[in-house]
Amino acid sequence: MLKYEYAREALKTGLKLEAELGVNPYKFGMIGSTDAHTSVAAVEEDNFFGKHSGVEPEPHRWEHVVIQAPDPKFTILGWQQASGGYAGVWASENTREAIFDAMKRKETYATTGPRMMVRFFGGWDFNAEDAQTRLPAAVGYAKGVPMGGDLREAPSGKAPTFIVAALKDPLSGNLDRIQIVKGWLGANGETEEKVYDVVWGGDRTPGADGKLPAVGDTVDVAKATWTNTIGSPELIANWTDPDFDATQAAFYYARVIEIPTPRWTAYEALRFGIKMSADVPMKTQERAYTSPIWYTPG
């Protein structure tokens, strides 16, 4: 991955420009899409039709040159394509008007393909009991703002607290963990970022370095199968920013990560009975990203 392929780089640039210009031109929400030119909506790893008609399923597409770059290290081969994603929209009803209203207020999230359900709310008064509810949206709207929203000047002595919840796609992998990605504008005018592991499946404990051990791996590459014997079908947590500085503009978004499952290349190798080169990944960890919640100092 290249630095500016991450949405957080644009989000951080937005904070910096807002400090300079008084407006944030990169205050955007997140959605996922197929990014394909085939008119095919399929995004499943076992049903990947490629990005255009020249790379539809066939035994050699994994080694086709999709984009030839002057510098060979930036040339994109067929196996480097990723199957598309979906847009999740929290609309009040299933109408064109309500869906576009939700998109306008950025109450949206992206997935890399699975149909996960993800909720993300920020506020000043959430507590641990709120993470025990079966209706996170009810407490989220009552005490905070949803994904895409804004938190204004912090009450004295308080740090922003978030409710984040995710439910797995019933046809996909269990959930590995939920992370919150934070970006902020430092005192020196430069932007910074940090990724926090907030809640996870299984009996794991962060190490001395603060990093959470991997969830494990049940993928059988030869058969292109996996088992949901690790991870969790749903996760929910209440999290407070431990590094909050009320004077610094910031954004927060949630990232939900699945356990490892077979990548489209594994399905293709099985389907056509072929062997790909050793550098071709056969596994993936699907994920979802919410629109951010922004904090603006008074």
Q: What kind of region is each of these model predictions?
A:
Residues 1-298:
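C-terminal functional module detector
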